[in-house]
Amino acid sequence: LVEYIKKVDQTTGTIIALQPENEVGIFQDMDYSKASLAAYGQEVPQTLIQYMKKNRKNLRKELLSVWEENGAKTSGTWKTVFGDNVWSKSFYTTWQYATYIDFISAGAKEIYPLPTFCNCWLVQKPDDMPGVYPNGGPVSRVMDIWKAAAPHIDVLAPDIYLSDFKNIVADYH
């Protein structure tokens, strides 16, 4: 697809960005397939651990509080580092989606180096749990995970259908 876009767009230059996925995520806390459960039992990638350590003072409270409540461990499985809870499953799911979409984005940029973005369906209410909204997408709660996992995504964007425009945009600035 990107090869075709490049071929068609090279003379006009009208394409300004590529969106590898739209409102990514699943409506549950995680994928319970055998492959996913096996991956969930593996170590949290050091890329994420190092990102959290380096950016600890600026991490979103949702990630920071879960990490600190579980001892701010710097190695271990998703359950070991983040606890046996919905948040460890959400963080794991987010990592999987973000690294996959980053892979797609990096490949697209090798063919046609345009900016890429990923948008998300926003959390509607503060007490909504992952899966009420598409879990794994770049909602503000897990934006730090997206930043660590998806360096080839240039913009994380909210898909805004709520009235609190100013605060939502501030979350993504």
Model-identified regions with their sequence ranges:
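Polysaccharide-binding and catalytic clefts of secreted carbohydrate-active enzymes
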Residues: 2-143
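Catalytic-core region of carbohydrate-active enzymes that cleave or remodel glycosidic bonds
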Residues: 103-114, 141-173
